[in-house]
């Protein structure tokens, strides 16, 4: 498919130009998202999504779409920010890309192959296209780098951590950071140290517990495979199952492929990894599709309860990303059995997808907040390379 462009917050006008701009790139396995911001990382001037493998043609198509939305912005790029999912144990904050940084990203790619490989490919294309400006890698893992040790350590033999670096990293950090920041603003001064749970629900899914803007727990772990049920990924699974499959003759590569690409909504429903198609099938009476949606909601709901307990209470629940933002049915299903915690949503507000869908002002607030990973990448690029 071709590019979808948007002029974002400031639509292009004839004769409009910007003196300097920041380009952001978010490369996935099958899509390339790009945006240009003003040089203060405050205003999105244009955005584009190319729905195909992010190769050289897709990259140039994205730039053309951005230029059409904000004439002059591409020639005015003064820095490029790249979303990189996994930075490993060494890259704990956004950083200017150097040969060493690139090598480090390559070294941890096997822990997030669906994400780091396209990011590295896009990084190479962008550095060739914009050789004279700083390139910044903004890591999804960075937001969780300072979690308490008890949230990071797995109860496995200690030498696994020392010898192989086994620990919890957490992912979708850029999304969780923005959502929690926006939730705190919506809560206002009523809560000076708010306890917030963020559910990032899309093709990839994760939850996090955030106290006063700092994450204290998250569902994804050493890799983006742990935690909630996802579009094609299983989420948390009894490790004994993997041992059983290996002893039964299934290869490591086959297990890797099936847990990453054939599980989750797709594997359970037998219909699709696309939540919308599974929902349609469930409404048409497909029992496996209904089971898949029930499992999806159950796992997300369990995470909310666990995180609220870990924080000693909850002030706000945030839904973000594709399913979280666009599915009133899934939001209602997740919250349905959490009324005992003070979580109640207004049905009409939920159907309209309003930002605040809370039913009672004195209860736990529930927000629907659009994901803005591009904005966070732009901010990190400004802070790291241009401040």
Residue ranges with predicted function:
Residues 22-57:
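Short glycine-rich, Thr/Ser-proximal phosphate-binding strand/loop in the N-terminal lobe
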Residues 22-25, 77-81, 136, 196-200:
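Short glycine-aspartate micro-motif
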Residues 27-28, 82-87, 201-203, 318-326:
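Glycine-rich beta-strand-to-loop/alpha-helix junction loops that act as flexible
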Residues 70-116, 133-136, 142-153:
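Short beta-strand-loop/turn "lid" adjacent to the catalytic site in phosphate-handling enzymes
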Residues 146-247:
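Glycine-rich phosphate-binding loop of actin/hexokinase-like ATP-binding domains
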Residues 210-211, 217-251, 257, 321-352:
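Catalytic phosphate/nucleotide-handling subdomain of diverse soluble enzymes
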Residues 248-292:
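A mobile "lid/hinge" subdomain adjacent to the ATP/sugar-phosphate binding pocket shared
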Residues 290, 294-315, 324-387:
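Internal helix-turn-beta structural module
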């Amino acid at each position: 498919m071709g590019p979808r462009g948007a002029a974002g917050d400031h639509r292009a006008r004839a004769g409009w130009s910007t003196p300097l701009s920041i380009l952001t790139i978010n490369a996935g396995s099958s899509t390339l998202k790009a945006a240009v911001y003003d040089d203060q990382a405050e205003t999105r001037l244009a955005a584009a999504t190319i729905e195909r493998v992010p190769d050289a043609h897709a990259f140039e198509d994205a730039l053309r779409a951005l230029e059409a939305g904000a004439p002059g912005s591409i020639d005015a790029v003064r820095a490029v920010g790249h979303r990189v999912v996994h930075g490993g144990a060494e890259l704990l904050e956004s950083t200017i890309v150097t040969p060493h940084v690139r090598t480090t990203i390559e070294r941890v790619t096997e822990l997030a192959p669906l994400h780091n490989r396209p990011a590295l490919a896009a990084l190479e294309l962008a550095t060739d296209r914009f050789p004279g400006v700083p390139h910044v890698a903004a890591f999804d893992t960075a937001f969780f780098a300072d979690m308490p040790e008890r949230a990071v350590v797995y109860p496995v033999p200690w030498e696994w951590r020392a010898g192989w670096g086994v620990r919890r990293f957490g992912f979708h950090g850029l999304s969780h950071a923005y959502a929690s920041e926006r939730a705190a603003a919506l809560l206002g001064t009523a809560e000076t140290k708010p306890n917030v749970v963020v559910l990032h629900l899309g093709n990839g899914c994760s939850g996090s517990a955030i106290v006063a803007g700092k994450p204290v727990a998250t569902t994804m772990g050493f890799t983006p495979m742990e935690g909630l049920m996802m579009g094609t990924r299983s989420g948390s699974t009894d490790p004994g199952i993997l041992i059983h499959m290996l002893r039964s003759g299934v290869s490591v590569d086959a297990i890797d492929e099936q847990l990453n690409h054939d599980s989750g909504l797709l594997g359970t429903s037998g219909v699709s990894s696309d939540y919308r198609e599974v929902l349609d099938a469930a409404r048409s009476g497909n029992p496996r599709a209904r089971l898949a949606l029930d499992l999806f909601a159950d796992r997300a709901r369990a995470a909310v309860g666990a995180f609220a307990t870990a924080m000693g209470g909850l002030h706000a629940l945030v839904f973000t990303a594709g399913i979280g933002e666009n599915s009133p049915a899934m939001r209602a299903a997740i919250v349905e059995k959490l009324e005992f915690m003070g979580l109640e949503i207004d049905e009409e507000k939920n159907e309209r997808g309003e930002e605040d869908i809370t039913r009672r002002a004195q209860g736990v607030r529930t927000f629907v907040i659009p994901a803005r990973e591009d904005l966070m990448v732009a901010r990190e690029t400004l802070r790291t390379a241009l401040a």
